[in-house]
Amino acid sequence: MLYLVHMEVNIPSSVSEQEAAKIKSLEKEYSQNLQKSGKWPHLWRVVGEYANYSIFDVEGNDDLHTILSGLPLFPYMKIQVTPLAKHPSSIK
């Protein structure tokens, strides 16, 4: 199943710079492994925001929930998920 996911990150000032850097490093490794596996085929930054739009290609809701809740930045994220379906006018 395909999902459009919007993620906004808000790391509170109570998190030290060192801890934030560590979390971001873990996040990068985690997300790149998912990209290499094909489960996270598209990732775009939102200009001027600490946010992204992503496409996930996973088995279903439970798989996506497991992936998203495993993100090291998950505790600091607001996430919106939209399931996608093929459009009848699409030529692909």
For each feature predicted by the language model, list its residue ranges.
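Conserved, structured core segments of small domains
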Residues: 1-92
